Amino acid sequence: MSKKKLQTIQAPKGVPDYIPPVSPEFLGVRDTFAHQAHLAGYEHIELPIFEDTTLFARGVGESTDVVTKEMYTFADRGDRSVTLRPEGTAGVMRAVIEHNLDRGQLPVKLNYYGPFFRYERPQAGRYRQLQQVGVEAIGVDDPALDAEVIALADRSLKVIGLTGYRLELTSLGDHTCRPQYREKLQEFLFKLPLDEETRHRAEINPLRVLDDKRPEIQEMTVDAPLMLDNLSDSSREHFELVTGMLDDLNVAYVVNPRMVRGLDYYTKTTFEFVHDGLGAQSGIGGGGRYDGLMAQLGGQELSGIGYALGVDRCLLALEAEQKRVTDGSRVNVFGVAMGSAAKREMVRIIDALRSAGISADMAYGDRGLKGAMKGADRAGARFALVLGDRELENNCVAVKDLAQQGQRDVSLDNLILEIQSAL
């Protein structure tokens, strides 16, 4: 009686795998973003994958779609409510408060990367497990810091080769002008024939209504009062200083007075990077200033500013522009051994190359020379090392330059130096 074959298991819906040849591009984008942050003085912070649910309910905003519809929340075995992190800023702020990082040199400048989780309808560029790289600068309310953060995000996108995006920004005001604007906006919204759920949202946070993507709501709110027209003098001055410094840095931008970010903690400067090559899911990253978030989470009255760039979205944007970026992790040397004695020696050679910092791999199994050389091509190797009885007798190896189609014998004693000088 034949044994029944077990059913295969697939990844959960909306959770992508990044496998070769895409994984080097994924790492290239992620690591480039992280490196640019490091160049600007942002130190790495590693955050928990899940947190106490209260952190996001209080920090992100109870009226946001993220909290009400998109979070992966569950009770652990101790019956504590925990949530897979939907974004990074709240977790960074929690860590800063918990470990007293705000008691030292300010601003605290941190960067992070990793997976985040939102229950959304999966489509191109929108996944339930999304990959982001972000920075946070905490503790100083300075327009120059806003300009630095925005310019850093802009530079990061340029370094990976993106050109077909635009930067949109606005100001969401501060505690002195937002209450009056809130009343004015609610007065406008309550005159509209809103459905019950939208009216409830207008009561809790009317800005959320302006963020509604339904065409009928967008049409009804086209004449809604705008925050940018109701800024306090200090908020207006702050925004003008930020845009002036962006001009000095040659960072191109478009002021979008109708912009509303999907998280409640943003104040003053708010921005988003948009790429029209992605269709409906055009945002590739964004961020802004958050003046009250730390106090809201039980810490000091300190402000901060940050951004998150979507690695998944940026990969799609690169594809739309027919560009590629890699992490440089290709195999430089691929070994091909002909015979058991040669294979034993090749194992030693490959290990010595790796110890010298040269990426190297070799053919395994009993493939012939032709099949093994195909492996070198698939690996993207610059050099192939061929070792057989002749080479063993002469204490050398045949080095094939796969880029320039040349071949020569190199002494085993000089091999590492020869490869290092050629790379």
UniProtKB/Swiss-Prot annotation:
It catalyses: tRNA(His) + L-histidine + ATP = L-histidyl-tRNA(His) + AMP + diphosphate + H(+). Its EC number is 6.1.1.21. It comes from the Bacteria. Its main location: cytoplasm. It is found in: Cytoplasm. InterPro entries: aa-tRNA-synth_II (IPR006195), aa-tRNA-synth_II/BPL/LPL (IPR045864), Anticodon-bd (IPR004154), Anticodon-bd_dom_sf (IPR036621), His-tRNA-ligase (IPR015807), HisRS-like_core (IPR041715), HisRS/HisZ (IPR004516), HisRS_anticodon (IPR033656). GO terms for molecular function: ATP binding; histidine-tRNA ligase activity. Homodimer. This is Histidine--tRNA ligase. It comes from Corynebacterium diphtheriae (strain ATCC 700971 / NCTC 13129 / Biotype gravis).
